[in-house]
Each structure stands twice: as C-alpha cells, then as structure tokens.
A protein has these predicted regions:
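N-terminal capping/lid subdomain adjacent to the active-site entrance of alpha/beta enzymes
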Residues: 1-148
Length: 148
C-alpha cells in the first residue's frame, strides 16, 4: 500500500471576530492533513491551541513525523498509540476515517453499531460583546434551534 501525505495550513477570517472570556479571535488558522491512496483522498483538519502548548509549526511537525508510517499504511488503531492526543492526532485520525469511508472500506453507521445518522441539534454561540451587538447577533440567528 502506498499513500501520499500532504500537510497544509489555511487561514480563515472570522466575520466580526469571535470573543469568549479568554480573548477574541479574528481568524482561524487550520492545519489540514490529506492522505491520498489509489485516487481517493481522505482529509482531516485541526486548530492548534496555545492553551495546550500547540502551535501551527508543532502540529505540522508532529504530522510529518508520522509520514513514513502513514505512507506505509498505518491505520487508526496504530495511530492511537503512535501519537499523543491533541490537534495533530485529530487531523490524522479524521483523514484516516475519511479515507477509509471514501474508499468503501468502512460504513460508519455499521461500524458504530448505529442506524443511519439523523439530524442533530447543535448550539450556536453568540460572540461576547456589547449588549446591542449581542442582541443583533441573536436576532440574525433566531432561526437556529439553540443559541448560547
């Protein structure tokens, strides 16, 4: 088995910024891991968090350090013991899941012992700010099922 590994960074602006008690973000820097095998590509991504000692460079280095093993066919089970939990392992794990599903090796519903997925309600977080701005955000997102 031969796989190709690609690691890239992307930067996405956050419209209006996003604020929580720890600070404000104006953009998201994302590390993307892509595994290509027999014309099929699996993709995973992560956001390194300084709070956990992660940087863009440290995450890229951690993923690239697994390059030879991933190219040789490392699977998800091996990955769990080969890399510590964190952003880098998350990106690689997601890429492996995506690759296996797209290659037809896995049916996620069957694998998880579940029926076909159903829509799931999630919360939309209103960015911390001035009361008027928060009220406007809430009004703009009033059709969402759950605001926090």
């Amino acid at each position: 088995m031969r796989r190709d590994l690609f690691v890239e960074t992307e930067r996405f602006p956050i419209a209006g910024g996003f604020s929580i008690s720890r600070g404000t973000k104006t953009h998201a820097e994302v590390v993307t891991c892509t595994l290509a095998e027999n014309g099929v590509k699996g993709r995973g991504e992560c956001v390194p968090y300084a709070r956990y000692g992660e940087t863009i460079d440290s995450v890229i280095s951690a993923i690239e350090a697994m390059g030879k093993r991933l190219q040789a066919g490392m699977d998800r089970d091996e990955l769990q013991s080969a890399m510590p939990a964190g952003a880098a392992r998350n990106a690689v794990d997601c890429a492996l899941w995506d690759l296996d599903i797209k290659a037809g090796r896995l049916d996620p519903s069957e694998l998880l012992g579940q029926s076909a997925p159903q829509p799931l309600e999630t919360a939309y977080t209103i960015s911390l700010g001035e009361p008027g701005a928060m009220e406007a955000q809430a009004a703009q997102n009033a059709t969402r099922p759950l605001l926090k």
